[in-house]
């Protein structure tokens, strides 16, 4: 059953904002401390209720393992770079253009441009990211929910704009060898959450 039938708009917004905050850039010290201090326990419980208990358990285990490092945040920052910032053979670049062929990418970005214009979202403002970066897609999806666009429109966006390439990205992320499995788990969880959101 789609999340739109199980969760309130506020809950779905929280979920997608959470994913965006973890994948937009390296975690800050306050973000990591909040995760390790159990401030997201109720959110993790919600994810478990939705069928993601294995991923939640894995994530909690990874957070516990981080305490063994002298500088957990720097360890995660290195993993973020390893997973997402190196060249294509070494990282799982979070860009649609890396996974779609020219025709599909052109169609995908044409739709993205329409939504970016409609919502007046600015690109290259803070992180110098092109419009095919995963977090730009999440920003548009968040706007679709915030502005109460019809559920069918939201699901079409997920299906056509994201799920045409995100499974390949998540699979590539899973193959990256990093110190922790934090980002591999987050990527898998995001994919599963999106797939369930249109079920």
UniProtKB/Swiss-Prot annotation:
Superkingdom field: Bacteria
Localization, UniProt: Cytoplasm
Intrachain S-S bonds: none
One Pfam family linked to the record: Nitrate_red_del
Gene Ontology cellular component list: cytoplasm
Primary location group: cytoplasm
Gene3D superfamilies hit by this protein: 1.20.120.1820, HscB, C-terminal domain
GO biological process terms held by the UniProt record: protein complex oligomerization; protein folding
Keywords: Chaperone, Cytoplasm
Signal peptide bounds: none
Similarity comment: family membership: Belongs to the TorD/DmsD family. TorD subfamily.
HAMAP family in the cross-refs: TorD
PANTHER family the record matches: CHAPERONE PROTEIN TORD, CHAPERONE PROTEIN YCDY
Biological role: Involved in the biogenesis of TorA. Acts on TorA before the insertion of the molybdenum cofactor and, as a result, probably favors a conformation of the apoenzyme that is competent for acquiring the cofactor.
NCBIfam families: PRK04976.1 (NF003442)
Name listed for the protein in its UniProt record: Chaperone protein TorD
Organism field: Actinobacillus pleuropneumoniae serotype 7 (strain AP76)
């Amino acid at each position: 059953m789609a999340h739109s039938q199980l969760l309130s708009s506020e809950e779905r917004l929280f979920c997608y904002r959470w994913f965006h905050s973890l994948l937009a850039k390296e975690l800050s010290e306050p973000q990591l401390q909040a995760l390790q201090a159990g401030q997201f326990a109720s959110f993790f419980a919600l994810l478990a209720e939705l069928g993601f208990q294995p991923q939640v358990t894995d994530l909690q285990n990874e957070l516990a393992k981080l305490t063994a490092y002298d500088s957990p945040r720097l360890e995660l920052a290195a993993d973020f770079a390893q997973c997402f910032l190196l060249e294509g053979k070494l990282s799982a670049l979070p860009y649609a253009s890396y996974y779609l062929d020219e025709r599909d990418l052109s169609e995908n970005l044409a739709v993205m441009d329409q939504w970016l214009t409609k919502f007046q979202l600015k690109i290259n403002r803070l992180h110098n990211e092109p419009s095919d970066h995963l977090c730009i897609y999440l920003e548009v999806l968040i706007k679709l929910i915030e502005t109460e666009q019809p559920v069918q429109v939201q699901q079409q966006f997920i299906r056509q704009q994201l799920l045409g390439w995100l499974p390949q990205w998540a699979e590539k992320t899973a193959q990256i060898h990093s110190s922790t499995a934090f980002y591999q788990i987050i990527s898998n969880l995001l994919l599963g959450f999106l797939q369930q959101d249109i079920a």
